[in-house]
Amino acid sequence: MAENALADVKTLSFERAIEELESIVKRLEDGKVPLEESVAIYERGEALKRRCEELLRQAEARVEKITTDASGQVTGTEPLDVQ
């Protein structure tokens, strides 16, 4: 079952993954979740965090920087260096 739960994380949109991650954080912060369940939802939270990071990296790779010449005229685009 745990493998299925983690597998479905790989299909979530960024918005859905972040929403679920926020829900998990809130539940853990409330401190009313039994230990075993806390561990399980923490592990899912880690998977959701990795999914969000992966989707953000993909989005960054698609962003392009607009280039201009000395007079400010647009000359094209190049990959954005986000380091």
From Swiss-Prot:
It is found in: Cytoplasm. One of its GO terms (cellular component) is cytosol. Transmembrane segments: none annotated. It catalyses: Exonucleolytic cleavage in either 5'- to 3'- or 3'- to 5'-direction to yield nucleoside 5'-phosphates. InterPro entries: Exonuc_VII_S (IPR003761), Exonuc_VII_ssu_sf (IPR037004). Keywords: Cytoplasm, Exonuclease, Hydrolase, Nuclease. One of its GO terms (molecular function) is exodeoxyribonuclease VII activity. Pfam families: Exonuc_VII_S. Gene3D superfamilies: Exonuclease VII, small subunit. Its EC number is 3.1.11.6. Bidirectionally degrades single-stranded DNA into large acid-insoluble oligonucleotides, which are then degraded further into small acid-soluble oligonucleotides. Heterooligomer composed of large and small subunits. Belongs to the XseB family. This is Exodeoxyribonuclease 7 small subunit. It comes from Nitrobacter hamburgensis (strain DSM 10229 / NCIMB 13809 / X14). The gene is xseB.
